[in-house]
């Protein structure tokens, strides 16, 4: 339905409406068309559900979320994007395949843009308390060296492109990721998820929406956790933020 009345007094509204991503097209190339859709539907949704938590899912999710925050004028906790929740899950899964350990015991995050400039935070990734860089032998007899980490990061970034090339769209995995986010809100789980809230002085990064580990509960996006970063991670995240901000400015936001 395209009737906003069905969302009246909703607790959570997940917005997936957006331009369709074509094979070979980056998420950022979708920005103009998708933001145009947001400009039409968001004011109507805010009118019927001013207290709802708005979870943006449409790509490019970080830019769309920033524009949505400006369009709605809602408090920063109420508007955030799905971020890299799915990317983080994919990274942990690939680590589990390399090490033979349960995904539940792997702790690590992907931050930044949900897209080509995203940054795996390897320096804080661990398995059962053991830093990934000190893990030792992997199942193939190798070690978790830089080459292996880069391959995992590449596979995570390319996974959506491969799916789009194969069947034309992504739906199941991102649906599960959004389900996890909505569950964290409705059940007030206070769960750490790499959603995309508005950042203000997060490791010196401000005025941009991008994925960082964030405590998510009934009030939406809460505290943004400032994990220790290496100089390289901070530099790459700053570059990712600059790029996202530039795209938003190009759209008039």
Summary of predicted features, one role per range:
Residues 8, 22, 62-66, 88-90, ...:
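Short, well-ordered, mixed-charge alpha-helical segments that flank or form enzyme active sites
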Residues 1-9:
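Short acidic low-complexity segments
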Residues 72-78, 87-231, 235-253:
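C-terminal substrate-binding/catalytic lobe of Rossmann-fold NAD(P)-dependent dehydrogenases
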Residues 2-3, 82, 111:
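Conserved beta-strand termini and adjacent loop/short-helix elements that scaffold enzyme active sites
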Residues 11-14:
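N-terminal Rossmann-like NAD(P) cofactor-binding module of classical short-chain dehydrogenase/reductase
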Residues 26-93:
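Rossmann-like NAD(P)(H) cofactor-binding subdomain of soluble oxidoreductases
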Residues 24-28, 226-228:
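Short acidic, glycine/proline-rich loop/turn micro-motifs
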Residues 17-19:
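Conserved NAD(P)H cofactor-binding loop of Rossmann-fold oxidoreductase domains
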